[in-house]
C-alpha cells in the first residue's frame, strides 16, 4: 500500500511540473500557446475556475455569467484583454479586478449593471479601452469613475436608461482618441462636464432629442476635433448664436448618421456650421430630409459661405417627398467655396446647370451609385459648369454610351481624372472625344470585349479591370499605370504598346503564364501584381520563377498569391514550391533518347534477323499461311503422286531419263510429280509447289551443287521444311547425285540437316553394278 501511494505521488508531481507555465484549460475554454483563451457563446453561468498567470487574453462574451467575484481573476496577473460583454452581469465585487494591473482592454457592455463603482477601475492603471455601453445604470456613479485611468484612450459609456451627465464624470481624463456616449434619453447635462478633457479626437453622441445638444457642442469647442451625431431627430433643434463666429475651435469635422432633418433644422445646421468656423468637413450618412427644400429662415440669406467648409459628403440620403422637392436655389451661394462633394446612392439624376456654375471652387465630385444618364449629364456639365473640377466620379450610374459621355464632358477644361466604371456601356466606339487634360480613366466593369482608339492618348493611368478583353493591342505611349485584372487575357500585354509603364495589375484569373523575356521587355516596370491567376506551371515558367532572384522586388504579392492550376497533380501548390519530374521538363530529350533506343533496338533486331534468317522465316510463314487460308474450289483430294521430285534444271537429264524411266516404267509404276511436266500453267509458282508437295506421299530432293545454287529448288526445299514441322513426319528423301558438303545446305533448314545427320540418305553410285541396288532402295523408301 505505501508503494502504491508513493507511485501516485510521483505521477502527480510529474504532471504538475509538466503543466507549470501553461494556462490551465477548463473544458469550457479553448486556449492557444500564446495565452489567448476563447469562451464565447458557451452558456457559461460563471467565470471558469483554474485560470492562471499564463492567460493573456480572455473572451467570455455572449454567455450567462451573472457576477464577477474577488477570486475569479486573481491569478490572471498578466491579463491584457478581458471581454465580458453580452452577459447577465449585475454584480461585480469591489476587488474583482485588483490583480489586473496589466489589463489594457476591458469590455463590460450589454450587461445588467445598475450601479458603477470607481473601486473596480482604481487598479487598472494600464487600461486603454473601456466599454460600459448597454447596461441599466442611470449615472456614472457618485464619485469619479475614471480619475485613475490616466492611460485610457477609448471610452464608451451610456445606455437607454442613462439620464444625466455630471461635472465630475470625466474628471481625470485628459486625452481621449474616442469617446462614445449613448445619451438616447439624456435629461440633464451639467455645464462644463467635458471641460476636464483637454482633447477629444472623436466624440460619438447618440441622442434622440437635440435639446441639450447646443450646450454640449459649445462645451467641447476648444477640445473636440470630430463630432459624430447618431440617431437624432432634429425637428426641434435650435442653435442660438451667442456671439460672432467662434474662431478658437478644434472641431474640423461633423458627421450626422441616421439623423432626421427638416427644412427648419437644416437652417439651424447651417448656422451651427457657420458659427464653428474651423469646420472643414461635413458628412451626412443614412439621413432623412423630411421636407420640401423650402429653407425660409431669414438669417440664411446673411450667410454667404459656411465657415471653412471644403468637403461635403452625403451617402444614402432619403427624401420621402422626393418628387415635390424644390431646386435648392436658395442655398446655391453657400456652395461656392466647397472643394469636394460626394453624393452616393441618393437617387441623384440631375445637377442643375445653375448649381454647377455656382460650384466655382469644386475640384472633386463623386456622384457614384445614382441615376445619371447622358442627357441629364449634359445639362449638369453645361458651359462654365464646375470650372475648377479635376476629378469626376460617375461610377455605377445609368450611362450607356462612351462616345456621348466623353463629348458631354468636353466643357470641363481642367478635368484630369474620370471614373465611369460599373456603367452599362457594353461596347466601345472607334473614336471618342475627351477633355484634353485627361490623365486618369477608370473603365472597369463596363462589359466591353475590345479596346479601340476611343481611349485618349493623354492617359497616364488606365483601369480596364473586370471586362471581357481577350487581347490588348492598343498603343498608349504615356500610360504609367495599367490595371487590367479579371479579364480573359492569356499572358502579359506586348511591352511595345506601353513604353512608359511603371505599374501593372493583372491578377485574378486574367493570365495563365508569363516569361522572363516578357518581363524584361518592360524596361521601366517597377511593380507587377499578377497573383490570383490560374497559372499553367510549365517547366519553362517554373524554371523562370524559381531562378529569378529579384522577382519579389517586382511582384508585390509574390509568392503567396501565385498558385498552380495545371498540371492537375500540382493544382493548388505555390509556384515557388512546385517541382515537375524530369520526364515532364525534358520531354524532347526524353523522346529523342527513346527514339534512339528504339532505332538501335530495330537495328539490332535487323542484324539478328539477318544473321539468323528471321526475315526468311517471316516471309515463308506468311506465304504458307496465305496459301493455307486460300479457299478450295474443289473437294479435298487424296494423294495423287508417290513423290514430288525437287531438282535443279541442270540435273533434269538424270531425272527425266534415268529416274523417271526406272520408277514410272516399273511394275507396278510410281507416279512422280515433276515441275516441268505437272505444274498447272498460269498458277502462282509457290502455289504449284505447295499443292504438289501436299499431294505427294514423299518429296525427293536430288541434291547437287546445282541444286544448292538453284533459287526455285530453295523454295521447294523451304516449303518442304515447313511441311516437316507442320505434319511432324519424315516425308523427305534425299538423293546425293554427287558428293556434296553438308555445310552447303543452308543452316536455316535445321530439320533437313538433322535428317542428314541422323538418317540414311541415298547416294548415286557411279559404278553401274551398284545402280540396281540404288533403285531398289529408292523404291523401298518411296513405299515406306
UniProtKB/Swiss-Prot annotation:
One of its GO terms (biological process) is innate immune response. GO terms for molecular function: NAD+ nucleosidase activity, cyclic ADP-ribose generating; signaling receptor activity; transmembrane signaling receptor activity; triacyl lipopeptide binding. SMART domains: LRR_BAC, LRR_TYP, LRRCT, TIR. The lineage of its organism: Eukaryota, Metazoa, Chordata, Craniata, Vertebrata. The keyword Nuclease does not apply. Keywords: Cytoplasmic vesicle, Disulfide bond, Glycoprotein, Immunity, Inflammatory response, Innate immunity, Isopeptide bond, Leucine-rich repeat, Membrane, NAD, Receptor, Repeat, Signal, Transmembrane, Transmembrane helix, Ubl conjugation. Its main location: membrane. SUPFAM superfamilies: L domain-like, Toll/Interleukin receptor TIR domain. Cooperates with LY96 to mediate the innate immune response to bacterial lipoproteins and other microbial cell wall components. Cooperates with TLR1 or TLR6 to mediate the innate immune response to bacterial lipoproteins or lipopeptides. Acts via MYD88 and TRAF6, leading to NF-kappa-B activation, cytokine secretion and the inflammatory response. May also promote apoptosis in response to lipoproteins. Ubiquitinated at Lys-754 by PPP1R11, leading to its degradation. Deubiquitinated by USP2. Glycosylation of Asn-442 is critical for secretion of the N-terminal ectodomain of TLR2. Interacts with LY96, TLR1 and TLR6 (via extracellular domain). TLR2 seems to exist in heterodimers with either TLR1 or TLR6 before stimulation by the ligand. The heterodimers form bigger oligomers in response to their corresponding ligands as well as further heterotypic associations with other receptors such as CD14 and/or CD36. Binds MYD88 (via TIR domain). Interacts with TICAM1. Interacts with CNPY3. Interacts with ATG16L1. Interacts with PPP1R11. Interacts with TICAM2. Interacts with TIRAP. This is Toll-like receptor 2. Belongs to the Toll-like receptor family. The gene is TLR2. A motif (ATG16L1-binding motif) lies at residues 761-778. It is found in: Membrane; Cytoplasmic vesicle, Phagosome membrane; Membrane raft. The record marks 349 as: Interaction with bacterial lipopeptide. It is a single-pass type I membrane protein. There is a cross-link at residue 754 (Glycyl lysine isopeptide (Lys-Gly) (interchain with G-Cter in ubiquitin)).
Amino acid at each position: 500500500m505505501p508503494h502504491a501511494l508513493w507511485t501516485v505521488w510521483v505521477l502527480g508531481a510529474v504532471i504538475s511540473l509538466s503543466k507549470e507555465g501553461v494556462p490551465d484549460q477548463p473544458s469550457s475554454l479553448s486556449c492557444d500557446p500564446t495565452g489567448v483563451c476563447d469562451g464565447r457563446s458557451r452558456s457559461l453561468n460563471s467565470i471558469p475556475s483554474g485560470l492562471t498567470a499564463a492567460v493573456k487574453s480572455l473572451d467570455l462574451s455572449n454567455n450567462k455569467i451573472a457576477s464577477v467575484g474577488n477570486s475569479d481573476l486573481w491569478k490572471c496577473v498578466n491579463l491584457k484583454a478581458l471581454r465580458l460583454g453580452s452577459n447577465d452581469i449585475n454584480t461585480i465585487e469591489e476587488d474583482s479586478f485588483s490583480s489586473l494591473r496589466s489589463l489594457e482592454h476591458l469590455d463590460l457592455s450589454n450587461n445588467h449593471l445598475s450601479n458603477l463603482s470607481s473601486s473596480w477601475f482604481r487598479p487598472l492603471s494600464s487600461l486603454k479601452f473601456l466599454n460600459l455601453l448597454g447596461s441599466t445604470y442611470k449615472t456614472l456613479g457618485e464619485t469619479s469613475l475614471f480619475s485613475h485611468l490616466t492611460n485610457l484612450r477609448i471610452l464608451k459609456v451610456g445606455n437607454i436608461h442613462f439620464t444625466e451627465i455630471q461635472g465630475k464624470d470625466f474628471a481625470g481624463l485628459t486625452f481621449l482618441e474616442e469617446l462614445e456616449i449613448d445619451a438616447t434619453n439624456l435629461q440633464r447635462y451639467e455645464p462644463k462636464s467635458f471641460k476636464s478633457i483637454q482633447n477629444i479626437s472623436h466624440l460619438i453622441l447618440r441622442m434622440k432629442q437635440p435639446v441639450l445638444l447646443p450646450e454640449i457642442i459649445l462645451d467641447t469647442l476648444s477640445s473636440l476635433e470630430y463630432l459624430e451625431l447618431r440617431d437624432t431627430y432634429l425637428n426641434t433643434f435650435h442653435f442660438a448664436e451667442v456671439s460672432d463666429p467662434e474662431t478658437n475651435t478644434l472641431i474640423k469635422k461633423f458627421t450626422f448618421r441616421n439623423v432626421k432633418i427638416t427644412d427648419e433644422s437644416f437652417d439651424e445646421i447651417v448656422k451651427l456650421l457657420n458659427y464653428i468656423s474651423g469646420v472643414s468637413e461635413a458628412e451626412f450618412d443614412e439621413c432623412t430630409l423630411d421636407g420640401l427644400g423650402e429653407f425660409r429662415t431669414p438669417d440664411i440669406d446673411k450667410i454667404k459661405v459656411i465657415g471653412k467648409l471644403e468637403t461635403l459628403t452625403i451617402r444614402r440620403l432619403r427624401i420621402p417627398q422626393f418628387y415635390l422637392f424644390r431646386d435648392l436655389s436658395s442655398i446655391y451661394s453657400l456652395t461656392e467655396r466647397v472643394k469636394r462633394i460626394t453624393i452616393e446612392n441618393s437617387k441623384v439624376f440631375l445637377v442643375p446647370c445653375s448649381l454647377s456654375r455656382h460650384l466655382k471652387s469644386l475640384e472633386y465630385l463623386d456622384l457614384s451609385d445614382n441615376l445619371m444618364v447622358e442627357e441629364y449629364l449634359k445639362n449638369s456639365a453645361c458651359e462654365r459648369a464646375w470650372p475648377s473640377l479635376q476629378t469626376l466620379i460617375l461610377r455605377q450610374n445609368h450611362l450607356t454610351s462612351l462616345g456621348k459621355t466623353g463629348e458631354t464632358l468636353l466643357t470641363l477644361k481642367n478635368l484630369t481624372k474620370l471614373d465611369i466604371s460599373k456603367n452599362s456601356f457594353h461596347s466601345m466606339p472607334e473614336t471618342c472625344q475627351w477633355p484634353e487634360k485627361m490623365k486618369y480613366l477608370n473603365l472597369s466593369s463596363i462589359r466591353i470585349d475590345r479596346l479601340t482608339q476611343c481611349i485618349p492618348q493623354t492617359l497616364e493611368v488606365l483601369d480596364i479591370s473586370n471586362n471581357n478583353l481577350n487581347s490588348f493591342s492598343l498603343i498608349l505611349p504615356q500610360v504609367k499605370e495599367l490595371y487590367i485584372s479579371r479579364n480573359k487575357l492569356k499572358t502579359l500585354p506586348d511591352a511595345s504598346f506601353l513604353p512608359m509603364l511603371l505599374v501593372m495589375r493583372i491578377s485574378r484569373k486574367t493570365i495563365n503564364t508569363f516569361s522572363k523575356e516578357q518581363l524584361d521587355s518592360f524596361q521601366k516596370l517597377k511593380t507587377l501584381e499578377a497573383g490570383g491567376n490560374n497559372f499553367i506551371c510549365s517547366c519553362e515558367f517554373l524554371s523562370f520563377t524559381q531562378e529569378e532572384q529579384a522577382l519579389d522586388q517586382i511582384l508585390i504579392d509574390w509568392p503567396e498569391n501565385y498558385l498552380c492550376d495545371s498540371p492537375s497533380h500540382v493544382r493548388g501548390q505555390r509556384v515557388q514550391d512546385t517541382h515537375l519530374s524530369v520526364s515532364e521538363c525534358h520531354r524532347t530529350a526524353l523522346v529523342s533518347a527513346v527514339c534512339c533506343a528504339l532505332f538501335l533496338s530495330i537495328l539490332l533486331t535487323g542484324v539478328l534477323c539477318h544473321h539468323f534468317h528471321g526475315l526468311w522465316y517471316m516471309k515463308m510463314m506468311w506465304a504458307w499461311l496465305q496459301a493455307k487460308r486460300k479457299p478450295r474450289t474443289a473437294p479435298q483430294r487424296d494423294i495423287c503422286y508417290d513423290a514430288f521430285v525437287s531438282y535443279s534444271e541442270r540435273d533434269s537429264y538424270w531425272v527425266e531419263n534415268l529416274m523417271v524411266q526406272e520408277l514410272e516404267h516399273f511394275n507396278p509404276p510410281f507416279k512422280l510429280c515433276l515441275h516441268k511436266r505437272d505444274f498447272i500453267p498460269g498458277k502462282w509458282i509457290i502455289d504449284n509447289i505447295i499443292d504438289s508437295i501436299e499431294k505427294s506421299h514423299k518429296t525427293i530432293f536430288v541434291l547437287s551443287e546445282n541444286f544448292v545454287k538453284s533459287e526455285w529448288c530453295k523454295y521447294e526445299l523451304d516449303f518442304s521444311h515447313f511441311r516437316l514441322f507442320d505434319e511432324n513426319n519424315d516425308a523427305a528423301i534425299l538423293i546425293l547425285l554427287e558428293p556434296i558438303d553438308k555445310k552447303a545446305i543452308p543452316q536455316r533448314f535445321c530439320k533437313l540437316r538433322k535428317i542428314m545427320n541422323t538418317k540414311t540418305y541415298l547416294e548415286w553410285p557411279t559404278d553401274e553394278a551398284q545402280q540396281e541396288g540404288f533403285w531398289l532402295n529408292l523404291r523401298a523408301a518411296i513405299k515406306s
